[in-house]
Design a protein with these regions (language model features):
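Extracellular structured ligand-interaction cores
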Residues: 69, 140, 205-207, 218
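C-terminal structured interaction module
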Residues: 209-238
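Bacterial Sec-dependent N-terminal signal peptides
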Residues: 1-24
Length: 238
């Protein structure tokens, strides 16, 4: 009897421990694939099928489409994919039926909003600001921004079919840049000091995708001038 009770207690403890570990894992950022393998080794194929992510509720993520044929942005469990149509237009559709060669994602139950300081108007200033306010033990972190940008530039990768890639220059063949001016936007971003060439370019700790509120434009954010007093930064609540 005592042995049976002891075994039951051990089983219950292990179950609780596994449950706690599962909950902890959902709060962390998952990074699949590596940017440098795409840029330098030409590994363009999809390493993750986004349709296979089981828990899509309150999911956030970003990355390129496999074979570098578009951009992906997941906002609050909704997945948006952009593809080049012309030098001045793109197509944005909502679907999880897409694969990515590298991708970062997490589920976030609650956000803590804070006004973006007026001193933060550029991507570099945003990077410095996040590095100051997010302690190392909470990195990598996925965050979001909402509000109005005065000016921004996003790109959508558009590698010609059958292209071989062995350098960043080759990886960006066909890429189209799109301006965004005086528009309300939502930005999903990734910050880490430990993921250069894995999920961020070698010269930055940030990887961000921007989508306009009308959902007519979405892409990788390259340049931005944030409007003073009009942007809100959201960080996950611990």
């Amino acid at each position: 009897m005592i042995k049976s009770l002891g075994a039951l207690l051990i089983f219950c403890f292990q179950t609780l421990l596994l449950t706690a570990q599962d909950q902890q894992a959902t709060e962390k950022v998952t990074v699949v694939g590596r940017m440098k393998d795409v840029m330098w080794k030409g590994q363009l194929y999809g390493n993750i099928n986004l349709d296979t992510i089981i828990d899509k509720k309150q999911l956030y993520g970003l990355g390129p489409v496999e074979y570098l044929t578009g951009e992906i942005m997941i906002v609050d469990g909704r997945c948006f994919v952009s593809k080049v149509e012309t030098d001045t237009s793109m197509r944005v559709e909502e679907t999880f039926a897409v694969k990515a060669p590298f991708f970062g994602y997490t589920t976030i139950d609650q956000w803590k909003p804070q006004s973006l300081p007026d001193s933060v108007q550029s991507i570099r200033q945003l990077e410095d600001h996040i590095q100051r306010i997010v302690p190392p033990e909470r990195r990598p972190v996925i965050f979001k921004l909402t509000g109005k940008v005065e000016n921004a530039v996003v790109h959508v990768v558009n590698l010609p079919r059958g292209s071989k890639v062995s350098s960043p220059a080759e990886a960006h063949q066909g890429q189209v840049n799109y301006p965004v001016q005086d528009q309300e936007v939502e930005i999903v971003g990734f910050f880490s000091t430990e993921h250069k060439t894995i999920f961020t370019h070698h010269e930055t700790f940030l990887h961000m995708h921007l989508m306009t509120d009308d959902r007519k434009k979405m892409g990788h954010l390259d340049e931005a001038q944030f409007k003073k007093g009009a942007m809100t930064l959201y960080l996950p609540i611990e």
